[in-house]
Amino acid sequence: MRAILILLDGLGDRASEILNNKTPLQFAKTPNLDRLAENGMCGLMTTYKEGIPLGTEVAHFLLWGYSLEEFPGRGVIEALGEDIEIEKNAIYLRASLGFVKKDEKGFLVIDRRTKDISREEIEKLVDSLPTCVDGYKFELFYSFDVHFILKIKERNGWISDKISDSDPFYKNRYVMKVKAIRELCKSEVEYSKAKDTARALNKYLLNVYKILQNHKINRKRRKLEKMPANFLLTKWASRYKRVESFKEKWGMNAVILAESSLFKGLAKFLGMDFIKIESFEEGIDLIPELDYDFIHLHTKETDEAAHTKNPLNKVKVIEKIDKLIGNLKLREDDLLIITADHSTPSVGNLIHSGESVPILFYGKNVRVDNVKEFNEISCSNGHLRIRGEELMHLILNYTDRALLYGLRSGDRLRYYIPKDDEIDLLEG
C-alpha cells in the first residue's frame, strides 16, 4: 500500500481585494482537487506552531516526523545537495555575492544578489579571496547564480555552528555582525567556540569586502554602470549530525521527486532516494511506475508565484496544477495526501507566513467528511486539525502500518509494524 504525498510549496495564502476577498486557492477553479476533497477527509495542518513562518527545509523535516532538535541546519543540507564532502570539524553556510554601500552605520544592503554578473566574473572575484583567518580555513563552493556553500574548518575542532547570520534577508537593512548565540550553546565551552568562530567569520567578511570593493572586476562594472559584487552575505550555519533514517523511523522505503538540490540534500541526510524531475507534470507521470512505500512529490511553483506578489499569478499556477493532478493514475489501495509545507502570502510584505495550511487524505481507509472544496476556508470545516508532527502517524494508520502503542518489537521502540526480517527472531 503506497502513500503518495503531493506537496504544493507555499500553497496557503491570504485573501486579497483583487480576488474578491478570497485566497488564490479559493478563487481558482480546481475541479480535480475539489473532487478529491469531496471524496476524502480534509482539514487544516499547522506545520509547527500557529503564527510561526517556516522555510521549506525545516517544514519538510517536521512533516516527516523529525524534531527541531534533530534538524542540523539548512547549510549542511544544501552542502549535501551539492555533493560536497561533509567533514566532522567543519560547519557549512549559504553565502551569496551582494551589493552594499558603506556609511557611518555600517554596510547597507542595496541588493542581496548582484544582478547581471557572469560566471567568469564570479570566478575571478572568488579566486582573489582569503582562505585562512586566525587558524580557520574558508572554502567556497559554487552553487548557482551568485550563491555558494561556505565551508569553515578548524583542524582541532574548535568551531561551532551556533552563530548568527550576516545576511539581513529583508530589504533596506544593514549587514549584521555575526554573533555567538548563547541559548543554542549547551556549555560554556561551546559558547567559547561559537564566539571564536563568529569573530573569525566577521574578520573574514571584512577582508572579503576590502578585496571585492577594489577588485578590477568591480571597478570595470562600475564604469559600465553595473552593480558591483562587493560583499559575501552568509546565513544558515550548520554542522552534520546523524539522525535515524526515514526507513528506520517509519519502516517505509521512500523517494523524493523534486527539482531542487535542497531536496537532494534532505534525501541524502535521511537516507531516502531522490529522483530529479524537470517539472511537476513529469512527477505526476512517473508516480504510477514507482514501487516505493512512500512517494513525495514536490513543486515550488505555487511558492514562486506567491513571491511575485500578484495573487492572479498564483491562481494560474494552482489551476495548472489542478489539471495535472487530474491526470494522476492511482492504484486501488494508494493513499493520497495533498497539502503544503507553509503559507506564502501573495499580498503584503512577508516572505512566508504562519497560517495553517489545507490538507486532504484520499484512500480506501479514510473517513469521508462533508467538505466539498479544497481551500483554506472549506477545509477548516473538515475532520482534521493536526500538527505537522502527526502527519506521518496518520499515514502509518491509513496504510495499515501503525503499531499498537506500548508494544515493543525488536531492540528499539517503533511506530510501525516491523517485518520479520527487520527484527531478531528467537530460534530453538
From Swiss-Prot:
Annotated GO MF terms: metal ion binding; phosphoglycerate mutase activity
Keywords: Glycolysis, Isomerase
Major enzyme class: isomerase
Pfam family, one: PhosphMutase
EC number of this enzyme: 5.4.2.12
Pathways involved: Carbohydrate degradation; glycolysis; pyruvate from D-glyceraldehyde 3-phosphate: step 3/5
InterPro entries listed in its UniProt record: Alkaline_phosphatase_core_sf, ApgAM_prokaryotes, Metalloenzyme, Pglycerate_mutase_ApgM, Pglycerate_mutase_ApgM_sf
Entry's Gene Ontology BP terms: glycolytic process
Substrates-to-products reaction catalysed: (2R)-2-phosphoglycerate = (2R)-3-phosphoglycerate
Role, per record: Catalyzes the interconversion of 2-phosphoglycerate and 3-phosphoglycerate.
Listed NCBIfam families: apgM
Family: Belongs to the BPG-independent phosphoglycerate mutase family. A-PGAM subfamily.
Name of this chain's protein: 2,3-bisphosphoglycerate-independent phosphoglycerate mutase 2
Primary gene name: apgM2
